[in-house]
Amino acid sequence: EGMSLDSFLVVNNGNYFKQVMIPVVDEKYFKNDMIVLFYNYATLPSSMYPNDRSNVDNWNIDFVYFDKNRSYNDITYPLITFSEKSPSLLKRYQSMPYRQYKSNPTVAMSTNYRMYFINLDSAGANVQYSCKIENTTNGWSYDYEADWSTVSPYANHGIHEYPVHFNNFLFDMDDKLDMATYQITHIVNVDENSSSAKGDTIVGLQVFNDYYAYDDGTPERGYGVVPDDSYFASQFTISVPDTLCGVQLLFNRTHNDANYDFFDIVVWNDNNGKPGNEVYRLKNQRPIWD
């Protein structure tokens, strides 16, 4: 038995973050072992293309906060947190083959990235960003600390964008290995003399294995290839000769399996940044859904 949370149906107008206040007044929920579960209901859009009719509704719950004696004006929290996931430290990819990285590491690395903070408290605070990069195999590590800075409340300033600059940073390299993983711990510390708010920590992994990836594989968006005989291509740049053994694709299932169509997987060589001559074609493939 649960509660219908119609307040989530309000259009968010593109805001980054929307706070919803839900009064819990029924005593049957006043238990120490109460479990909070959220279920969403997706809608199917009307579209001229049947293969667009899929689960395009996408929303996320940031955090759930319970407290007694609250009111609708109680909308701040003593927290200064990260509002985005750990970024890739590579210039072009989320992940790439270790042998390709080792052949030209300077070109592969990004010289800067951006972290995003959100101050949910009612007042500003002095904070410091730091990170620690650790090789999960051999213990090699690298530490970075930024200068202290002031972050204003979200209600006044919104999201804080913090640029991070690494000067000539490279991951350590082991010629004997064909893969490596680095744990990257991001920390935002709060000066206790400026605020009683708590800071935050997030952890990400930088993986060098045997594949290229532009993102972390989380299905956040999708698109269809229409009309018939259309195609799209993804470009991957290599530093040393390599072998393509396979590709991994996610097909988002649509209403009545409208996108259960045949397609070809094609490999082209490069022609000034665009597909050139066809070098391989795997014909008549179809999506496979779990």
Residue ranges: model-predicted function:
Residues 1, 131-135, 265-269:
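Conserved aromatic beta-strand anchor motif in extracellular beta-sandwich/beta-rich domains
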Residues 1-116, 121-127:
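Beta-sandwich/jellyroll recognition modules and their flexible linkers
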Residues 9-15, 257-290:
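Aromatic- and Gly/Pro-enriched, solvent-exposed loop/edge beta-strand patches characteristic
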Residues 18-22, 160-162, 232-234:
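Short strand-edge motifs at loop-to-beta-strand transitions and within beta-strands
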Residues 30-40, 175-187, 247, 290:
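Short, well-structured beta-strand segments enriched in hydrophobic/aromatic residues
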Residues 58-59, 124-129, 256-265:
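Short coil-to-beta strand junction motifs in C2/discoidin
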Residues 70-207:
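Activation corresponds to long, low-complexity, non-globular regions
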Residues 185-273:
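Beta-sheet-rich sandwich/jelly-roll-like modules and their strand-loop junctions
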